[in-house]
Amino acid sequence: MDVIDAIHTRRSIRSYSPHPVERDLIEEIIWDAAQTPPPFSGQVPWTFNVLEGVERIAAFGNEALKYARDSHPAGPEWDWRNRPGFQVFWGAPVVVIISGPVEDCCRAGQTFMLSAHARGLGTCWVGSPMLWLRTASTKAKLRIPAQLMPVSALCLGYPATIPEAPPRKRPSIIWVE
């Protein structure tokens, strides 16, 4: 698969096979994400924390959901908290958390998703647990270095289903002459 195919065919996967992902494969994808994007800060300032096991990850997701319900004001951006059957990590067998400077983690996260897709794996970048992930107690529990900020929470696994591409709008392009 070439990079253009990967960009146009990658989908956010929200339904995963229970088949575990091999650690060697996870490490290869992390290597791609850590070594290939140019670092914004001129160094390699991030960490990758890997969670494995559907039940264990679901328990962390329930903690994140409880934190969101207990700690945040109501509003349309928080409607996901009350959706029946909502799962923070979508039943994924692996979640990778990238922590560090925002610019670097976003580059690493996108590269991670494309590398996984090229290897037949599905991903979904989830934003719902981010405030929970940034609490001192959660960072300690997940062994995220205290001085780093979690930026990317990426579900990873073999897709059970692959959704169709949604309709896309043309981007707003402003030529400055």
Question: Where would I find each of the regions flagged by the language model?
Answer:
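N-terminal amphipathic, basic helical "cap/leader" segment at the start of enzyme domains
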Residues: M1-G91, E177
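Short coil/turn connectors at secondary-structure junctions
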Residues: G91-V94, L121, A146-P150
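Short glycine/proline-enriched turns and hinge-like loops at secondary-structure junctions
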Residues: S41-Q43, R107, A165-P167
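C-terminal helix-cap and adjacent tail motif
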Residues: A6-T9, L25, N82-R83, P150-E177
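Small-aliphatic-rich amphipathic alpha-helix that forms the alpha element of a beta-alpha
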Residues: A33-A34, V96-K141
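Short, hinge-like loop/turn segments at secondary-structure boundaries
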Residues: Y67, A140-I144
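Short beta-strand-to-loop capping motifs
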Residues: E52, I98-G100, L156-Y158
